[in-house]
Amino acid sequence: MKWIPQSARFCLFGQSPSAKGVFNIYQLNRGKLELMSEWQKAFGIKCGTFKASPVSIRDVATVDYKGKLIIYDIERGVEKYNVQAHAHMGNQIDGIGGKGSEFGAPELVTGGADGCVRVWDPRQEAPVVSLEPSENEPIKPDCWTVAFGNAYN
């Protein structure tokens, strides 16, 4: 669940019992929740962030159970960016920038069950940085969390 910036709405992500992706938008209206939009996606959505999107646009970046990084237009529920970020499930995502030229380019960081950490610029198809476990490691550790921090314009 992520609050939509500067609104009384939030996105709810997840996976249904039929293993389809859940992407719902709810709005608070006089203390009650109203379902505004409901979309079913091909695969479960693990998590998302608005941090790499300007407030005026409010695109949400997500990682799913098949390792895809997808940026959605929340007003229409359509994909604006779609790339295979990880070989297995994406576990976490964070973002920074994209708020204007003084705050830098939009960037996303993802961590996955394949043990990789990748930094993405959504204006490009490939990651700008990819940290991967050694090829000769018998067991690849999961990457459970990622975050941008201490980065001020």
Task: Spell out what each predicted region is.
Residues 1-153:
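WD40 beta-propeller repeat fold
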